[in-house]
């Protein structure tokens, strides 16, 4: 999402934070399979490390975007809010109700495709919603 926001020259208007609901990989860079797909699409991940989601994040952010129902439940337990969405909510006519975790599926291409579509649609929503 950061690279899309940067391409659209909106980095001064939109901040992106990527946070984890579990503490399993805190401080680690993206999975090697994720690194390969990001490299394939020339997306810089050099400053991306897993960080823990906090209650303060839920207060500070305008949108909380999750990948699946498990993440949704974790976030809602921390702070029930109407600003929590699954990324697939923004993909028109999406067959998937969640973003499959490539750690388990090993299908990094499908996950990238869905995340890319979702991020582009989410950005269009934000631009329209906030008159950017």
Identify the function of each model-found stretch:
Residues 63, 69-132:
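Phosphate-binding/catalytic loops
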Residues 1-59, 124-132:
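Conserved active-site segments centered on acidic
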Residues 18, 67-68:
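Residue-level recognition of conserved beta-strand positions in structured domain cores
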